[in-house]
Amino acid sequence: MKNNTTEDLSLIKLPKPVFSHCSTVLEALKMRRTYRAISNKKIPLQILSDILWAAQGVNRVHGPFGGPGRTAGSASNSQEISVYVAKEEGTYLYEPDSHTMTPVAAGDNRSLAIGPGQRTSGANAPVRFIYVVDVDKFKTAGYQEPGLYDLEVQKSYYFVDTGLIAQNVYLATSALGLVSWFHNCNKTKLAKILRLKPHQRALFGQTIGYADE
């Protein structure tokens, strides 16, 4: 890994998502699979844009409680999960409202976006997503249900909300001719590399790419 400053990285403005792909939801479900043998073939920026939008992009300006609505639901529209994108040159934070990728750490951190005992699978994949929760966002959610302040309830919510995003990624990659794999990550090292705050924590990773067949 290189020094994790971001001086050599720039904000990436993603192209608008393309909605003309021919696969239906049922076809994507039929093709959905967890696949670990992923090649190093680069993912075009348009395809990455489409997958990120599917993950948790803005699909309506006025969602629950007045804020923008996203493709993946969340508890009381808390939107407490963020998607980080680990690529060879650096790691970026996906910003749904502007549909951009903001650099947060330079260098190749893809090996940290997977559990220590899983590194040989999909090791050459061009992209790994990292799912990070910010539990403070529960306190500012639109609907202040008492459960949002209960730590165990919070945990159940953010695990489910992460799963909703990950399933969107599974369906998008299936529809676009790619494969993906949802897995663990190196939570301790990612917290340092991504400069996470005490109320943030890395939860899971998801490897994205083309099947190595």
What does each model-identified segment do?
Residues 194-213:
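A glycine-rich helix N-cap at a beta->alpha junction
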Residues 75, 181-182, 198:
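Short, surface-exposed helix-loop/turn micro-motifs enriched in polar/charged residues
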